[in-house]
Amino acid sequence: MKALDQLSFDNRFARLGDAFSTQVLPEPIAEPRLVVASESAMALLDLDPAHAELPVFAELFSGHKLWEEADPRAMVYSGHQFGSYNPRLGDGRGLLLAEVLNDAGEHWDLHLKGAGQTPYSRMGDGRAVLRSSIREFLASEALHALGIPTSRALCVIGSSTPVWRETRESAAMLTRLAQSHVRFGHFEYFYYTKQPEQQRVLIDHVLEQHYPECRDAEQPYLAMFRTIVERNAELIARWQAYGFCHGVMNTDNMSILGITFDFGPYAFLDDFDANFICNHSDDRGRYSYANQVPIAHWNLSALAQALTTVIEVEPLKETLGLFLPLYQAHYLDLMRRRLGLTTAEEDDMALVERLLQCMQRGGVDYSLFFRKLGEQPAADALKVVRDDFIDLAAFDAWGADYLARCDREPGNAEGRRERMHAVNPLYVLRNYLAQKAIEAAEAGDYSEVRRLHQVLSHPFEEQPGMQAYAERPPEWGKHLEISCSS
């Protein structure tokens, strides 16, 4: 493992030039202190986790110190926000500090969120508050533990710097890790500003650095776009299967790598509700749970439009047409596994849809249902979960078909239990748990944030003394309103 001064750097994106980003120094926050750090994220940089407790760690990730090799940059991009094009967005409060080259030959962006004003701040103060920084940290690491592709969170650094939102809050900085911070909106920016040369430079950069397997294809750009479509189909399938709602699926929040990116007013489903809206600013439900699939397709079509400078329209349309069948295949595979099924039958999707309809009518806790379904042999488990449903006739009919389906599966009850426990989490990041940790942190107690992070890092394993994190949320905890304010 390495010390902080032993990291290797290779700032590839910064070398693209000033057309793609602006050099900006971070604005330090006062009295920086470590709130929480992720050991597994530190391992991506080969960093010794013990170094998180050193004063220099907080100084480096709060803007007080910089590595000599750092080249902090605010990236420029645009994007469609709630369906309307915004021609100039960019990093309004974040900086790409540097790219770390680890011992495995992987490049990891160090991105400092809440680093102060940039040319793209648009009247904002460039700061992030403690609560939003904690929420992004917890979500990044929780999704990673669930096997959902995501950016990672290295740490949150708190401070005594005041900032004003609805009330006075304290500023914080979150260090995000990703192998690229290029978004769909980067390509839209150069397309709509009619800068084809710069756009081709960006496309070649992404192809060379992030999709090298596509370079030797007959049409490398089209092969890259197809891979982006494939990755997004799998990503959204995982969101839907695990009940994750992003909340702000603007094209500037879509990663070119097909990972979960830019966490705001997200939520995991508590009671199953296909029409659930986690962002209280989303009056029309554009980014509701049910709409995430068509919105992902819409966003990919926006990316495709931006790529028409280098790819013919018809091949782009054909490739876009792959998204929905790919999504459906991934989603059905994940739901089979959540139900303990290892083989495929023609009526499996109908079985899943009928279950979700029963859940919708009964207000059934989405995550706990699957966990309880795997606790015992199928017939016994159905008796346990039956009490959670309202339409008992419909559930009993579903249960009979599910039992018959299980009877056609190979293996025994114990094997089924192990399979289901390996894919059905006991612990999920519920908004009320995050809120309790945030309130403690705002009062100066970081122990709950760290404890919750540790619990969520092992979501499938029962952890002694942590039963409170596996409970159904109280009524007040189901209706927390989360906005984009951060």
UniProtKB/Swiss-Prot annotation:
Keywords noted in UniProt: ATP-binding, Magnesium, Manganese, Metal-binding, Nucleotide-binding, Nucleotidyltransferase, Transferase
Entry-linked Pfam families: SelO (PF02696)
EC number: 2.7.7.-, 2.7.7.108
Top-level EC class: transferase
Signal peptide coordinates: none
Top-rank taxon: Bacteria
Swiss-Prot/TrEMBL cofactor(s): Mg(2+); Mn(2+)
Annotated residues for binding of Mg(2+): N253, D262
Active site (UniProt): D252 (proton acceptor)
Catalysis: reaction(s): L-seryl-[protein] + ATP = 3-O-(5'-adenylyl)-L-seryl-[protein] + diphosphate; L-threonyl-[protein] + ATP = 3-O-(5'-adenylyl)-L-threonyl-[protein] + diphosphate; L-tyrosyl-[protein] + ATP = O-(5'-adenylyl)-L-tyrosyl-[protein] + diphosphate; L-histidyl-[protein] + UTP = N(tele)-(5'-uridylyl)-L-histidyl-[protein] + diphosphate
Binding site for ATP: G90, G92, R93, K113, D125, G126, R176, R183, D262
InterPro entries in the record: SelO (IPR003846)
GO molecular function, a single term: AMPylase activity
HAMAP family according to UniProt: YdiU_SelO
Its biological purpose: Nucleotidyltransferase involved in the post-translational modification of proteins. It can catalyze the addition of adenosine monophosphate (AMP) or uridine monophosphate (UMP) to a protein, resulting in modifications known as AMPylation and UMPylation.
Family classification: Belongs to the SELO family.
Protein name stated in the entry: Protein nucleotidyltransferase YdiU
Organism of this sequence: Pseudomonas putida (strain GB-1)
Taxonomic lineage: Bacteria, Pseudomonadati, Pseudomonadota, Gammaproteobacteria, Pseudomonadales
